[in-house]
Amino acid sequence: MSSIIVAMLLCAGLSSPLVIRQSCHVQVAAHTFYGFPDNDPPGCVIAYDCGRGLTAGGAGTFNDPLTFASAPGEFQICEVIYDPYLRKYLRMEDSCDSCNRDWANKVWHIDIWTGSSTVSGGNDQVNCENRLTPAPQHKPIIRGPGPNLLVDATPLYVTSVCNAGSVFSSYDAQSFC
């Protein structure tokens, strides 16, 4: 059935699939972070091409969302969400083993990309990822966000610099919808 709809859209002159935005709502998800040194395998390669090839990255804006990983079926591939804790837009572009284990128990989990797509920050970067991980880990995210939410484009990690101060623990998640 879906292939018939796609064929009808292509015949109607639409060269790319329609993206139907879901309604905005709040979802609580565990937050963890990953990057070049602890990606599996180490490096910047991601599972899904959502417009930048198979390379993790992004600034966190609506037009350049930061990569996040999750379990298959938890989010739509290439789905864009907004994270008030980071004040960044994120796009589901990768998979995550710990997310898979959590999702098997119906626990929502996002693993957010940090750092460079070309250089490993080694243990310094992994330590930064641990500092960025909130306690408690479960924070609200916004699914189906509008394009004009407040963004902090400060990189989470740049060689030897952990921007753990660029997180925002106090907010009313519902106000973002």
Q: Where in this protein do the model-derived segments appear?
A:
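Cleavable N-terminal signal peptides of Sec/SRP-targeted secreted and luminal proteins
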Residues: 1-17
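Secreted/periplasmic proteins
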Residues: 13, 17-177
